[in-house]
Amino acid sequence: MRRFAILLLLALGACSVPQQTIRGVIITGQNNHNWPVSSEAIRLTLEQSGRFEIDLAVSPPAGAPMDSFRVDFSRYELVVLDYNGDPWPEEMRQAFLDYVDAGGGVIVYHAADNAFPDWEAYNRIIALGGWEGRDEHSGPYQYWQDGALVQDTTAGRGGSHGVRHPYVLTCRRGAEHPILKGLPVQWMHAEDELYDRMRGPGEIGDLLCTAWADPAQRGSGREEPLVFTVNYGKARIFHTMLGHAGPTLEDNPAMQCTGFQVLLLRAAEWCARGRVTQPVPADFPTAEAVSLRPGYRP
């Protein structure tokens, strides 16, 4: 009996040991979007889960010398890209590529897929991009049609979106991926931009979520890939086009959406560790109703 009690105490003690937090960095500081809001919303979402410790790497302002901008990627299991601005210095670019090539975890968030149209390796890391002069020379359009991901080499601009509105996301062939496992097949996302006509040279790994870009909302009339993983060497890369930042943290529906935050949290763990240990929360949105977490807290 005494031996059983000791074993039970040891087991309970093991269960109570806190999981080691994941160290991550958000690269930000220049963007055509409201980066002070987006970077803080991402930091709050990750840190308030208790699973992450997040630093901010803030670049010099647009037009200022970039020579001193550096990130020590060796300190991090996770890199979140929230940057669309001036080119990084060569040493920074090479350090990022070394991190990715070594199997690092990367989240490509929203307008980070607008950045660096002439950097070939970056465009393969993000798979799809838009704006900044992208066209048929940047790679094919990719969209979901008749149960398959289509690659369309038609000439035309890369990147557009209609008016911001709530829309339904559908989980596709990545439904059993650890990031999506247990989530509903369809769920309602809060008011947001819906990127369409994105194109690029990269290879989508698991297509996780698509949405219909409704022509009535000035969309493409296609089922657009908005959330996916990217095949690039040993790296674990998650690309989400969701999450247009609002004017303030308090008025930021696309990032206050529970679905956005849950995907971000699960993806961050997967990118860093290759697994997802988080349960599906009770407040996850349904196909009919948006769910919000205004304070960015589970």
Where are the language model's segments positioned?
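Helical hinge/lid and interdomain linker segments adjacent to catalytic or ligand-binding clefts
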Residues: T21-F116
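Sec-dependent signal peptide recognition
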Residues: R2-L7
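Active-site rim elements
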Residues: G29-N32, T154, R164-Y167, P184, ...
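Catalytic beta-strand/loop cores that center a nucleophilic Ser/Cys/Thr
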Residues: E47, E53-D55, D146-R236, G295-R297
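Extracellular ligand-binding/catalytic regions of CAZymes and related secreted enzymes
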Residues: Q20-I22, Q48, P215-P298
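Bacterial Sec-dependent signal peptides at the C-terminal "C-region" and cleavage site
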Residues: L8, L12-R23
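A glycine-rich, often tryptophan-bearing local segment used as a flexible ligand/cofactor-contacting loop or short
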Residues: D86-P178
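Short, solvent-exposed loop/turn segments at secondary-structure junctions
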Residues: N31-N32, D86, D113-A115, V185, ...
